Amino acid sequence: MSQKDNTVTSHDRREFLKAGGAVTAAMLAPTLLGGETQKTLPGLPSNPVTPKAMPTRNLGKTGYKVGIFSLGGQAALEKPNNETVAVPIIERALDLGVNYIDTSSIYGGPERWSEQYVGKVMAHRRSQAFLATKTKERTRDDSMRMIEKSLQLLQTDHVDLWQLHDVGTLYDVNQIFAKGGAMEALLEMKEQKVVRHLGLTGHYRPDALMEGIRRYPFDTILMAMNAGDPHHFSFNDALLPLAVERQMGIIGMKIPGRGRLLSNWIPQPIEVQKKMWEGMVLAPTPGTLTMREALYYTLSRPVSTVIIGCDSIAQLEENVSLAREFTPLSDAQVAEIVARAEPVAKPGLFFRFYERP
């Protein structure tokens, strides 16, 4: 079914307008000409290259077969005025068989460059990619504004996965599930078939994500899971088994820890690092792993896929090639990689070492 087959009732449209969805409603308006038929979502995306390009796994209970390597919305995709680099990376990813693209309403600052670049490709290749975005807002109304703008920038009338971004503390969870909280927006948009599935994401502490999972049966979880994880505030110990038990789609991120786990990473000068987000934990030396080791560690965990941002087409092609060649590591190999990651685990998990409310 094509996107043009979508229809929406006038009641649905009125409700979405109440939520501040004027722009999105305008995008859907042509379908109103078909009358009072119920809006339906198109079939799941399908990239015909994926099964030949890399192994696939079930994305939880969503019914989607996702390639084990997926494209993250940061790196080149979040840089300002970087269309000539970012858009070809996205196009090439789809050509290579990537069938899941991650982005967020906060990637690229107020201009939301990441969603802009992804949208330029989705305008003509929407049916080939499972499209995921996020809201970091904690209220219903602010999240409604976020999804409205996301749809506009992504040049689509629906997203396959809408996620609560960076759920780090119980304070976040309580805000999200409070009356007027962001969870209301997620449920409304799913009911109105503006979003297909719901998820949550996090990289700070496992307890908050576990509490979120207990409060609502989310379809997916996007969690930081690299070879440094077992050494500091581990997500592997309790969060990962809970997500597996709930049969969630599990998406791994922060695989190379912004490069800091990798032996070929060149540290920036310390004074430069201090001005960066990563600078909350300084990294004076390179890492200890190859990209193959870092990637295969996470893919040997019970994940559906991993998202990795790429700075160049060459980097993208290397990652897809590694995914194509993947075979699971033995327990002994996993233990050896974890042990070698220990000296650089804290810099590779820098996102777990800053103050949160």
Regions found by a protein language model. Give the residues of each.
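N-terminal secretory signal peptides
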Residues: 1-12
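N-terminal twin-arginine translocation
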Residues: 10-15, 25-46
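N-terminal amphipathic alpha-helix/helix-capping segment at the start of soluble metabolic enzymes
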Residues: 41-70
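Conserved, mostly hydrophobic/aromatic
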Residues: 59, 71, 101, 118, ...
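Glycine-rich, proline-tolerant flexible connector loops at the mouths of alpha/beta enzymes
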Residues: 102-120, 170-171
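Alpha-helix-loop-beta-strand connector modules within alpha/beta enzyme cores
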Residues: 115-132, 184-188
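Glycine/proline-rich, positively charged
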Residues: 138-227, 231-234, 238, 244-251
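Structured C-terminal cap/extension of enzyme domains
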Residues: 237-357
